[in-house]
């Protein structure tokens, strides 16, 4: 697929509000910006219209309004003023710009606008406000994959971006918005689509198409005998689904090698459960609804690599694994009480088939660990919609858990700051000895127990213990700070941070991962 085919709409770099190519101006700002209008060359012409409107509606910067302006200033005669509300309090953050832009474009769509021009007034407290606003503006413009495939149309003809700054600022904004929008499309297409449209084989087909003729090497493991031999726990989760050819498992490997000498190597493993029935520990009472998004960890991996594909960062190598399975229930389903030997040689005692995510990722993570031992400055990641406990703990925020070497590097703190700056905050959870002790086997048959028989929301430290399990079961724990070969590892439990099904998601923590890992090399 071409870059343009993955964009929600055509992104255009604008130079003036007087450009007749646009049929509305969407202005995002706060009350604090009122005094700045005259001093900002790009928007000074509409200052009188905004000031006059404020005399009629003093709360305009706390809401979204359609304002008629003179066509000699804005050719379309339409100005959509979308206020952020108060952004001066300690707890206000840059996401107010994201929300305001989303509301502004939503109003533009309802007004029949096809080519809006987005302008975000600067705020020294939030240097990334223009980018964050643009990503918010594109959210209602996204068209779901199945609709695009059937109707082949977009909601807008184009979205103009008028950056407040010089030409370099404008060019960088356009480049980043295109990269993020394409990555969002890949993420949403995979993460939101239903379990048949994005069954494991069709995810593989989609990813191969999305990265065709690009900078990412895509390899798909589709031989079920190979998956059974090399990734036995992943195979166990998909055992019931394997009886249906269209539902058979796929392991998708993505690889990027940037220009120049490699300084950092990232291994990112994503959970890709296309529908989570719970397996034999069946989800009942409507709790299965929305479980098509249990593949969103893999979706974030796909989006992360699309951003890399577009931005072409230098001096890094990145390897991704999208672990695509379907946790079905049936005569051949895996069950509790099984003891399965993992790729690492650790024997795993199964307690709960609805804790399948950690099993799905474990063997590919072990493979990534094996590769990392020969890589330059490696950092391993798992990304998953893993536990309800994380949702109860942090709401719509992802949680990151570092092992010893990653913690010593200060990575979680750094990426937390990056998330704040780019409007996608992330929380830090810490691991303690009891998290590791919890997963020690209770019988001689096994080395480790997968979990317990309770849901995570009824388990103490229910989102921290899986990170300990993944370390022990992959033997990453043998590469701690005091070992001869330390390996950095960070587990990210996304919980429900991308939003509520079936609303359009906002890929999370994709913005933060790209900003923290990729942008420093661009």
Curated annotation (Swiss-Prot):
Zn(2+) 2 binds at residues 271, 276, 294, 356. GO terms for cellular component: cytoplasm. It comes from the Eukaryota. Zn(2+) 1 binds at residues 276, 354, 356. Gene3D superfamilies: Zn peptidases (3.40.630.10). Its EC number is 3.4.11.-. The active site is at 283, 358. Binds 2 Zn(2+) ions per subunit. CDD domains: Peptidase_M17. The keyword Cell membrane does not apply. One of its GO terms (biological process) is proteolysis. Keywords: Aminopeptidase, Hydrolase, Metal-binding, Protease, Zinc. It is an enzyme of class 3 (hydrolase). Belongs to the peptidase M17 family. This is Putative aminopeptidase W07G4.4. It comes from Caenorhabditis elegans.
